[in-house]
Amino acid sequence: MKTVCVALSMLLISSLAYAAVVPDFQGHYERYNNDQLDTDTAFIDLTKLGSNIYELSGTSVWVGDSSSSLVNFGEIDGIVTLKGNQIDYDVDGCTLQILLEQDTLVVSKDNGCGGLNVTFNGTYVRTPESQ
């Protein structure tokens, strides 16, 4: 009985230690360019649904010549699986590769996720109020 209690205690301690090391990427992220908010606004929201399952949503905007009032946008929304520090988003022909660090997302390989000149590519920083 003592051996079982010790084994269960060790399992609980190792589980708690693992949980403390796995980062939580949930939050609101905004795209930055040269340490400033990007003039072509883009944001991504991650909501944790399970241990490695997130709901991902976001919007990216491209503003053309102000005299012509051209504005194009793209939207993303779906359930994604975190694999290591990467999310591969693929919904309705829109694909993204997202690499996650503690407070940043790096989006690349944007394909088909918005109107003309719209892209989600770039570096996103988690806003402090969403941590």
Regions found by a protein language model. Give the residues of each.
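Acidic, glycine-rich flexible loop segments
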Residues: 86-102
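N-terminal signal peptide c-region/cleavage motif recognized by signal peptidases
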Residues: 14-16
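Edge beta-strand at a domain terminus
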Residues: 69-86, 110-131
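Generic beta-strand structural signal
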Residues: 48-49, 82, 100-101, 126
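N-terminal glycine/threonine-rich, aromatic-flanked beta-hairpin/loop signature
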Residues: 38-79, 109
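Positively charged n-region of N-terminal signal peptides that target proteins for export
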Residues: 1-4
